[in-house]
């Protein structure tokens, strides 16, 4: 992968173990990452997905989900308008560019999910000892998953991860995302919310507007002028 094409690489498979996982049509595998590089001045965009196959003519469907719930990679918000589909003709390592880049904000979790539209063999990493060589794959809970037609299974107990990566790039922006602004609510009244960026208070209706109120629980605000995006602000109950 050329560093000039992609800036950052999200992955978990750290060893050279040539593990092979046989999957049936309809099975899914996923990795959940935490975005680390976005800022108020530069946005981080997922540009491509990389995966390993050990068989030919593997049909796939790729979707990315923002902030999925623990243990359920597909429970988040879909980030691609439609899944990216195709057929991998030969075994090997493959980089698949997305037709449209997907932005992830610093601190967001995002799940890269691949569904096989045909049976196939994919690459995965795990602890292994062949006597003449051994492999150690350090894993944590909530990183890599396999779907068996019924439920998602965390691969951490087996010290395994699927060989699935996300490549991102950085792009300058002239508007600050509200997620990078701090917020406070003085009370349970939506009128009491305060937004500020680097100590500067944002002005309602000039820098942001309230687009949704959920009783006295929270409000959703949307950026205006020099500010972009939306932010959910929970109201104080006491």
What are these regions (language model features)?
Residues 48-50, 61, 95, 111-113, ...:
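Beta-strand secondary-structure signal
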Residues 171-238:
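Solvent-exposed beta-strand/loop surfaces, strongest in extracytoplasmic domains of secreted
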Residues 84-92, 104:
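Short proline/glycine- and polar residue-rich coil/turn motifs
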Residues 1-74, 102-109, 115-170:
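Beta-sheet-rich sandwich/jelly-roll-like modules and their strand-loop junctions
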Residues 73-82:
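Short beta-strand and strand-turn-strand segments in soluble, beta-rich domains
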Residues 82-83, 205:
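Short hydrophobic alpha-helix segments
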Residues 45, 56-59, 90, 106, ...:
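Short loop/turn segments at connectors of secondary-structure elements within structured domains
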Residues 93-101:
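Exposed aromatic-hydrophobic patches
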């Amino acid at each position: 992968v050329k560093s000039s094409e992609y800036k950052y690489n999200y992955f978990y498979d750290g060893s050279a173990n040539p593990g092979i996982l046989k999957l049936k049509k309809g099975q899914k595998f996923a990795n959940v990452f935490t975005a680390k590089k976005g800022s108020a001045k530069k946005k981080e965009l997922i540009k491509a997905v990389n995966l390993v196959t050990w068989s030919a003519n593997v049909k796939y469907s790729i979707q990315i989900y923002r902030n999925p719930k623990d243990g359920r990679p597909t429970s988040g918000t879909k980030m691609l308008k439609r899944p990216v589909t195709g057929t991998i003709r030969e075994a090997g390592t493959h980089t698949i560019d997305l037709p449209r880049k997907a932005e992830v904000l610093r601190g967001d979790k995002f799940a890269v999910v691949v569904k096989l539209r045909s049976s196939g063999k994919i690459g995965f990493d795990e602890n292994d000892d062949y006597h003449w060589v051994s492999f150690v794959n350090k894993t944590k809970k909530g990183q890599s998953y396999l779907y068996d037609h019924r439920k998602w299974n965390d691969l951490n107990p087996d010290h395994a991860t699927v060989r699935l990566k996300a490549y991102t790039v950085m792009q300058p922006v002239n508007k600050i995302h509200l997620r990078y602004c701090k917020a406070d609510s003085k009370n349970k009244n939506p009128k009491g919310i305060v937004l500020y960026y680097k100590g500067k208070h944002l002005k309602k209706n000039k820098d942001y507007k309230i687009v949704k109120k959920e009783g006295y629980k929270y409000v959703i605000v949307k950026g205006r002028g020099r500010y972009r995006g939306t932010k959910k602000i929970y109201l104080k109950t006491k």
